[in-house]
């Protein structure tokens, strides 16, 4: 750790960097930390930045502002919710903290730089930075710097945005240009979130070209910028020196290197050109994430230093024009790293949303508005006809005063009619080619994407889901359609098995007949469709019974299935009372199989009902509840463990079988982890799921609310109460505190 960290505190760092200071280096000090999870941590980081500025106030007091020490500020360390969905809090709470740091820097004649982090935070950072630059309290201060990552595809547009900012407010912005240190995370995040492309360049040569392009733009605009080029690549540094000399800007920039790295190169240059050392400061407890990034960055084969000492790589290869390398790599880039939508062989990865993109979020909010007050009329769909009858009001679980629509449940006669039609259509549907059935599922996937804004609205209004949960569920529904289409094709051809001489044995798969699909309310779109499309593509006709609490969502999905090409006599939509459905449908000998997601107790009832019949054995596919546990030992990074615990516990308001129920923690870390969890819970917002900033919505209904409140009362008597999340939502909703 001592190799890469200047000291455990700012005073030790000043002592340890004294020899480099005497060589002529300037310094930028970074308070190590990977981002606050709690308000307490944020305040501690704020104090560390203020203390560091105070410790530096008397160093090089007579030198110009940009030659004095600098503090690098990690915005995520100053606020536990530094993300665009929490932008209102960012622009008030986080802004007040970074302004406090900037005011002290201005008082002492020092500079600060806002460190670059993950790409999903960029829009939020730019908005915050613009507010800082335009603040009248900094009218005459030129010491608020910005860090730009060259691997970001938005690097050039960001520079142009900053030029406009500098022009408007008469600023000269110190701008540190780096390659970028979160590449692996950016790639994985883009794949998991289903982005249309990667926010960063995927080839090192492309990042190298971007770095040079950004360098050129910065050097051509030194009236607005003081460029600070952070590189250990000798070829890149040489190109910058040459370009600066051509432009007559030899004294208009500086280089930067990391503490513990690049000394042999920059020690040769320091007499001619200014160089600043980026110097991490902090305890070894906070070192690991930073150290891993450095090791990953410098351990790869494409690293300049590694290539320089590799006897198998000729020097002329290192000196090759990076533009030529980039052009050569254009064709191979996508082959080596597929786009997020193409990472799965045989099917596409569903598209998601970049929730940190300001334009995307504004567009989504505007489009959602058209569905906010829509009233839905739904009912059973038998042989393609929507049946009317006595209907139930469907009210939103977050506000019982809001009417979502009405649903007419199927009665005894409706269920018998649906069963008859499904039975009559089963043989013809089974004879349809697998390819034609699979194509219908892929059509359905496309139709869901086209209707996703309405589904987001419905999932919020009828199921009480937050924005993150709705997007995840819609993507899961799309993935189900594409996945089962792929699997059906893979299993469509008979498979020849080993056999005796003169004998041929084949294994082939066929539809069984009529399937009953019984889905839950906690995933009213994804699981409903997952059950139904799997049964359909396998050649079965289907009776689909959704949960009564979320039947409108299933109704809209069923309408899309017909539009996608499912014959109206093959799929019957029958929202019904559970007991009645069991008596009429599940006890009937026509039923060949049941797909069920719900409680273990109900699964046992279904199993017994099927077993009592005097008919061929029906298949029961049951997905039931359980106790999900997590074990955390002392090897875990507690901040990361806290993130996982919060997500597992509270996504979908904890209403999923995979939600964390029991946490086992090693004694030695239990107190520290408990404090982190308490602090992270205090930052969660329990409110109206229509608000993008909401983290937890309501539970589904009054019964669920009562059950949870009763359990909380019981546990408060039997166990030690640690923390709960405060409600900010409507008093007429089913919220749990």
PLM region descriptions:
Residues 30-32, 74-76, 113-117, 147-149, ...:
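Generic beta-strand/beta-sheet core signal
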Residues 281-282, 286-289, 293-420, 424, ...:
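Terminal low-complexity tails and localization/encapsulation signals of metabolic enzymes
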Residues 563-565, 587-589, 593, 600-737:
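ALDH superfamily catalytic-core signature
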Residues 3-11, 15, 21-27, 37, ...:
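Catalytic cores of nucleotide-enabled group-transfer and carboxylate-activating enzymes in metabolic
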Residues 460, 488-640:
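Rossmann-like NAD(P) dinucleotide-binding subdomain of oxidoreductase/dehydrogenase enzymes
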Residues 401, 422, 437, 459, ...:
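Residue-level signal for inorganic ion chemistry
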Residues 1-351:
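Positively charged, amphipathic and often flexible ligand-engagement surfaces
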Residues 21, 53, 57-60, 133-136, ...:
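Structural signal for hydrophobic packing residues in well-ordered secondary-structure cores
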